[in-house]
Each structure stands twice: as C-alpha cells, then as structure tokens.
Amino acid sequence: MHPIRQRLQFLFSSTKGLILMAMAMVAVVTALFGMLSGPMAEWGVRDVVVRLLGMKLVQAEREGRIIILYHSIAMAIIAIESYMITGLVKMRPIHRVVVNTGVTAGYLTTMIFGLLFAYWGRLWPFHGLFIAGLTVMFSSGVVLTVALWPWNKEFYIKGPKSEYARTRSGLDLERAAFFAMAATTVVSSTFGAVAGAYFGNGFEAFLAENIIRSPEKTTLEYSVIGHLHIMLALIAIAVTLIIGRWLDFKGLYQKIAMPLMILGVVVLNLGVWGVVTPLEPIAHMIIYMGATPAMLAALMLVIFGFDKLIREGVRGIDRPTFGQKISALTRDPLRFGSLWQMVFMNFTVSGIGILMAVRLDEIFRVWPAREERIELTGHWHVLSAIIATIILFYYGDLTGLKGRLRQWYGWLIIVLSDAAFASVTFFEMKRLFISEAQQQPLVNWLMAGIDFGLGSLLVVLAALMVWRLTDLFKKKGLWTREAAEENLYQVAK
Amino acid sequence: MTRKFASIRRLLFTTLVMAALGMCACGPADVGAPVPVYDTGADTTEWASIPAGEFLEGQHETAVSIDHDYEMMVFLVTYEQYAAYLNDALATGTVRLVDNTIVGHYPGDEFRGARHEVRIDPGDYLHVALNDPALRLEFREHAFTVTPGWEVHPMTMVTWFGAGAYCDQYDWRLPTELEWEKAARGPLDGRESNRPFPWGSEIARNNANYYASRDPFESMSSYGSRTTPVGFYNGKIYGAFATIDSHSPYGLYDMAGNVWQWTGDVHPFEHYRYLRGGSKDTYDMDLRIWVRNSAAPTYASPGVGFRCAR
C-alpha cells in the first residue's frame, strides 16, 4: 500500500488514529484562537494574528463567533469520547464503523467550515456546511445510542456471578449508563438546535452569561441556557464512564455507582428539560436531585480507583506505612491524575457553586453583573479544561507512555493545570477578600498562574503532538502497531 | 527508578508551593500613588443637545425612536463638581452624614416579589462611603475637598442613590438606558449609524481608557488601571501619549471606557440598576455601545461614575 495512504488509513480509520487526529485539531484550534482574547489581546498578539491570517472580526458578531468556536471544539471533544466509547464498549462492528465515520465527518465539517464562516467573512455556504456538520454529529449520536442498546441479549453479562453491576436477568448496568448518557445527549442537543435555528434565522446570537439577570427570559432563551449546561454535564459524565472502563471499575463500588449514575443522568436531564416547561420554577431543585447521585457515582469510582492504585503499589509489602500508601497512590500519574482531577473539580467547580448559592444575597444580589459573569464563565471553563486534562491522561496511557516520560507528562499536566485552575478559582472569588482598588498585584499573580499553567499545558500537548507527528514519518513507527488495534481496553464481562 | 520518579514529583510540588507562597506574599496596591496632572481643556459645564428621532438600538440594530428632545452632559460628573454639590446638600439637609457615610432619602420602589428581586422600601440609603481608601474626597472642617490631582477625574465610589441625588439637586436626572444609548450611537442617518463604539467601528488603545490600554494613568504592575480626567481622549497629546478625538456623534466624551455610568431606569421585577459604557477595568468588548452591566443601587466602585440628563 502507498505510504501516504497507509498513514491516512491510520488517522482516519483506526480508533487510536482517530483520537490522535481529533486531539491535534483541538490543539491547533485552541492554540490559534486562544490568541484572540484575554492576555493575548492585552499584549497585542491578537492584532498581529488577525492581520497575519486576514481574519475579519466585526464587533457586533463577536458573540456569534464565540458560539461557533465553542461548538467546533465541543464537537471534536464529543468525537474523541465517541471513539473511546466505540473502542471500550462491546458493539457490532458495523455500528462502530458508522459511528466513527459519522463523528469524524461531522466534527471536521463543523470545525473547518464553522470557523471559516465565523472568522473569515460571512460566506453563507460555509454556514450551511457548519450546520450540516452538526447534523451529521447528531445522526451519529443516534447510531451510537442504538449501538449501546442495553437490552440486546448479546451483550448481557452471563454466568452465575459477576463482579460488574447487572440486573438479575444479566442486563449490564454500566452499558445502561452509557446508553442513558448517549440517549439523553441526543435529546438534549435538540434544545440547542431548536433555539439555535430560531435565533440563527434572525442572527440574534447571544451568550447565556449576558442574559443571566434578565427577570423575564423567553422559553427559547431558557432552552439555550439548559442546553449548554446539560451538554457540558453529559460530556463530564461520559468521561467518567470512560475512565471507569479504562480502570476496569468493578466490585461493590461499581454495583452501587452504576444505578446511581443512571438515576443521576435521567433526573439531571429531566430537570434541565424542565426549564422549558411549567416546571421551570423547580427545575433547579430537580437538577440538584440529579447531580447528587451522578456525583456520588463519580465518588465511588474515585474510591475504587484510589484503592486499586494503592493495593497495586503496596503489593509485596506486609504492613505498608501511610507514606508507602501515598507513594503507591501517586506512582502512576496518569491513572492517579484522571481520578484526582475529579476530586479537584469539587474545589474549583462544585464547591464554588455551592458557596455562591449559600451567600447569594450578599454576592449576586449586590455584585455587578460583570463580576457574576467572571464567576460563571470561570467555573465552566475550568470544568471543560478538567475534562480535557482527563482525556489527556487517558490518551497518554493509550499511546503507551512509559517510564520517565510518563512521569513528566502526567505530573506536568496535574501540576500545571491545577495551578491554573486554582488561580482561576481565586480570580473568580477575589471580591470576597480584596477590593477593586487594591486588587491589581493579586490579579497579576493570579493571571501569571493562569497563563503560565495553561500556556505550559499547551506546550506539553504540543510536544506530544510533535512526537506523534514525527512518529508518522517512521516506517515502523508506533502508528503501525496502533493501526492494527481496533479495541482499546475492552473488558470481557 | 522509583527514586527518580519521586524527584520529579518533588520538583514539581516545590515549584507549585513557591508560586503559592509568592502569591500570598503580594500586598495590596498603593491606592494613594501619585497621579499625573494634565489639562484637557474640558468645560465640565457643557451640555449636548440630542433631538427626538430614530436610532439603531442594541447589538442587533433595531430601529427605535425617542419622542423627545433632551440634553446630556458632555462630560462625566467630576470629583470637583460632586464635592461642591455635597457641601451644598449637607448645608441644605438633602443628604446627611451618618457614621462616616453620606446618606439620603429615597422614596422606594414598587416591590413585585419576583424571583431574586430585593425589596427597596422608602428610607435612607448610602450615597458615598467616606472611609473607603479609593474615594478621592476629603472631609475636613465640615467641608469636602478633592484629593489634589483628582479634581477633574470622574466622580467614583458613588452609589446609584448618590448619583441620582446629585442630578436631582439641580432638577436634572440620570439618563434612561435608551437616552444613554442614543447619545452614544448617534442618529439613524445612514452614516455609520450602527457604529459599535461612539467614534466608529474599531477601537485603538488611544480611543478610550480600558483595561491595559497603556494610558499615562495606569500601571498594570502596581496599582492597575485608574481613571483618566474627563474628556481626556480629545485628540491632544499628553507627554508621549497621543489620544484620538473620540467623542460620540452628539459630541459627548467618555461614552466608552473610563467608568461605567449609572442610568436612571427602575425596571419592574428587579432591584438591579443598569450601567453603560464599560470602564477602565474591562476589556474592549465591554466598551461596545449596547453592552449592559447591572448592580444593586447601593453598589459603589472606583470604576463607576455617572452623568446627568435634562
């Protein structure tokens, strides 16, 4: 076979190649478009990039551009998760091929044509292709849902005893959780699609954080707000399930976690869908009721995973000390990191949300809307980035990082990302402990933490991508082995 | 091998701890740092006439009409003007000095019990807190004076009640959001009627005072962004800093950047009051004409000021 065709076949048809390709696309888009805002704009980098690349940035179209950028990145992340799911969960080969082909075509079309439309002049055929890309992603989601159908006897857990959660008849509850996540993702995407079609027709793009204080919101505005929240929550739930599969989550904790996860996913979605119904006044309460079991399920995974890492690490030691246990827990930064980030998320996302809710009257009822916006956008950017780092940990393992390289890669991601996320969290909350007039030195330190952390993280990602790129030039590179692997870590149940 | 891995972890954790310690060691900014003084030539008593008629409102450019002529101050209310007002108002009793704060009466708003709505009953409300180090006023021997150097800077650290009371004192009022927006955007006359900034389509660092706009009043490494004198961006050159004349189509200055400006609307179902124009502390995107900010009427900040309408 022609060498170029072989490599393209690896990138576009093998599971690991597809993941690599999507990660490279996200890395390029993040690096490029990250130069258009925040400190990069402050330092004048934005102006240079805009001039060099011939971008056309109309002031009134900023919100629309950002919406397209978010969707472009989100579709690539959903594609990566889909590849991981088709590689981890048993399904018919035809389903795997259709899903992988669909999401690849979908995210690439969405990303390429969406960004061309948004940043290089409004060429309408590109907008049409952007929508077409999203539609293909939706259709692939439907196929994935069908592929994950848990009542297919072929995929029941057989045998008298099992370490995995199942019903008495053998229904695999983890598969049911994947199915619930996929099915509700497909339904929830329509909450964005319907509202998007309406606002898009009138080209009245808006960012949800800018209408948060409107006392009267329309049903379609609620729909957009619900959509963005639930989609991010479902992406987080998907990555939790993926990590569970990677770590071979089983035993008592898994048997408790899976029913909780299914319940959480269903109730959480019902709550979010409720925002466009007369249930809107109590929708938040329903959402809390759904979020709690879902987060408890994630806690079960963390407990299981930590315990597993410690057991593996102290094997052969009669009476391990606390220090030896900690050392065992942190020996593999990739597996530890993926679980640690779920714990850390509680300090930077959930904890902040709870604190804000408790002190609502003295914070949001008084603070200016722009401060509230910082807190809102800050906490969901952190959640998105935490999900991205968890994917990076898993990918590091998938790509076979070992020894010192694995240590540097894993620990750099943990330390750099957490330094950045902690800085973002302090930045969001700064008004609680420093006045506007006195904040600048603190802001400078925090911004340095954010910029250094995220910037260095991108350098780590770039190093990984360069390594994989150079590998593609080798005749017998890592890619030749990965091309032959269809499944990732599928565990026979 | 394990020892090597442990050293990697140790190195990274040490770096993190050092960074955290560095952050804890940073002190607050020097609020009293000296301020440069420039003569902008602004006549702070000037008013701009805005005729009735249509303009393009909002980001999505909806044609809206205002059915009355009105006037708005060409410049933001300055510290000098507010100090003079406070001395008058204290003498006539329209405001009172209570526990190091200036308070005044407000007749209250109708409370509709909407979600998140906070009740504003008739009573005395905060106008200015005198003990805030960011306030550029001094109260000595029963009279207010301005901290030297800040005389023609916009009055800040003033609540919505304090801003409204100033305008009331002279039988003026705060502009409505719609009036403010028309004054910034200009009439619907076909010539850049949809301009996103009061002066046109694009923004440069010498158009307005915004975050990290590098004006002579800011030092991002120490005290951060500070206000510029009213009407500073008038095409003059101040030392090495050349400004662009950035008035709105009706001739108003500082309609983008410098300080957020209180507007007068009391919207039903909410206690929030709305602010327009962006400030020294926001990125350029918040200086676009249609961008809204809101806060409780008791909120005060070094980045919030006002101007009056009549």
Where are these regions (language model features)?
Chain B
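Bacterial N-terminal signal peptides that target proteins for export
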Residues: T2-T15
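C-terminal motif of bacterial Sec signal peptides marking the signal peptidase cleavage site
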Residues: M23-A25
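Bacterial signal peptide processing site
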Residues: G27-A29
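Short, low-complexity, disordered segments immediately C-terminal to signal peptides
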Residues: V31-D39
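A short glycine-rich, aromatic-capped structural motif
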Residues: G41-D124, M157-F161, G257
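Functional-site microenvironments in short loops/helix caps that host divalent-cation chemistry
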Residues: L56, E138-N293, A300-P302
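Core domains of carbohydrate- and sulfate-ester-processing enzymes
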Residues: L97-A143, N206-P216, M220
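Short, structured beta-strand segments at or near domain termini in extracellular proteins/domains
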Residues: P302-R310
